[in-house]
Each structure stands twice: as C-alpha cells, then as structure tokens.
Amino acid sequence: MTAHIITGGGTGIGAATARLLADAGDDVVIVGRRAEPLLAVAATHERIHAITADAADGVAMADVVASTTERFGGVAGLVANAGGHGYSTVGSTTDDEWRSSLEANLTTAFVAIRAALDELERSRGAIVVVSSIAGLAAGPETAGYTVGKHALIGLVRSVARDYGRRGVRINALCPGWVRTPMSDEEMSVLVQRGDAPDVESAYALVTRDVPLGRAADAGEIAATIAFLLGPASTYVHGATIVADGGSTIVDVPTLAYG
C-alpha cells in the first residue's frame, strides 16, 4: 500500500485532485502551510490525510515523506502543485518579492521532488509538476510568476533525464484559466478596476479569445493529473502537457479578424 502526496492540497487544483484520487481508492496526503483549508479537505474523505508543512522547507518535506512512508508503506506519486504570486514588473520587483515568488513557484517543487525521489524510485512512481501557460508565455506585470513557471519546465526535464532509467516518471502540466480561489482573486482585480461588473463577467472577459470559450473547472485539471499519475500514461515522460482550452494555439496577431 502506498499513497500520493500533493503540495498545495488545501484549495483549488490540489484539493480537487485529492478528492478525485481518493474517490478512485487511493490514499492521499495533502500538504500546505495553512491547517484550516487542509483539514476541511481531509474532512471530505476518509482517504485524504492532512499534514501542515511548508513545501519549500527541506526538513519539513523530508518529514512528510517519512511520515507517509511509515503510515502507507511508500509514495506512489507526487503532485507538486504549491505556488504563489509574483505580480509585478522586473523594475518594480523588490529583492524580497523576487525571492518569495521563486520560493513559492519553483523551490516548493524542487524541494518536494528531492524529498520524495528515493521513495518514488522504490515504487517506480510518477510526478506531476503543475506549471501554467505562464510557463510558456508571458503575461503583463508577472515577472516572478512567469520566470518561476518557466523554470518548472526546466526542472521537469532535468529530473526526467536523470531519473527515468531509475523508474521515476515526471511530467509538467500547464493549465490555463481555472476556476480556483486564486483565480477568483484575479477576477476581483478586474472588477475593482471597472473592467467587469462581477466575477462571472470577468471570467468571460479573460476567456473571450479562448477557443473553448470558458475557464476550466478544477476537476478537469485534476482528471489530467490523475491520467499523468496513472497506468494509462506509462510512456509519457518529460512532457509538457497543456490544458488551456486552446489558449496557446491562438495566433494573437489575427484576433482582429475574429
């Protein structure tokens, strides 16, 4: 018996993934810095177990892996989903903001992967690193976030190159807009600026040029993560999987033509 570990498991994509995996019969350990949302998610399913820890803390993540292994016999998969903000231009980003953004968006994944690698080798397990389409292109005034998400793809490729022959699979997942509490906050910025009258209108605004015409539900992204962790994707390795409703296929200079 083994379990999956999900960082950033208290809300959004992490919480949706935990529920989906638990419903499928897997044990899941969710990790985050805030106990309250973790416990709320864990209360929804007997197979979801919460550990309060900072995914960027090497000692803390080593303890999470050790506790998971002791309780469940090993680690079957890791979802490196923790992330954070980094919303400013290079010129207006302070040193502290830069460090904080890279810690939240990149270091958390690096530390979690490093902590889990030995157990994942033993189980021949899989890793999914949740990046973003911000890992493929740059939005305005998002220097720290954009750089961190781009770097995650490099991290995935490095681990894939070094650990594939040791039995560990790893892939990057790049979602577009997903309805999560963090995205709701970003929609609220558009409402406050007067660009949209409410959050629903803001989502419509930011997805007006998305070929599917909408944001994803967190459960849709969770299903993609479950696929990448599972037996249906055993030859998918070192890949960057995009789940963005078609956003990144759009030829921006042709938008005026409809």
Language model features with spans:
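Substrate-binding pocket helix/loop in short-chain dehydrogenase/reductase
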Residues: T89-V90, E97-L102, V206
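Alpha-helical segment proximal to the catalytic Tyr-Lys
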Residues: D118, R161-R165, T234
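Residue(s) in the substrate-gating loop at a strand-loop-helix junction
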Residues: S132
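C-terminal substrate-recognition "lid" of short-chain dehydrogenase/reductases
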Residues: F110, R214-A243, T248-I249
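Short, small/polar-rich loop/turn modules that mediate ligand/substrate recognition or access, typified
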Residues: V79, G164, R169, V236-G238
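Conserved glycine-rich cofactor-binding loop
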Residues: G10-G12
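Active-site helix of classical SDR
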Residues: I113, G148, V156
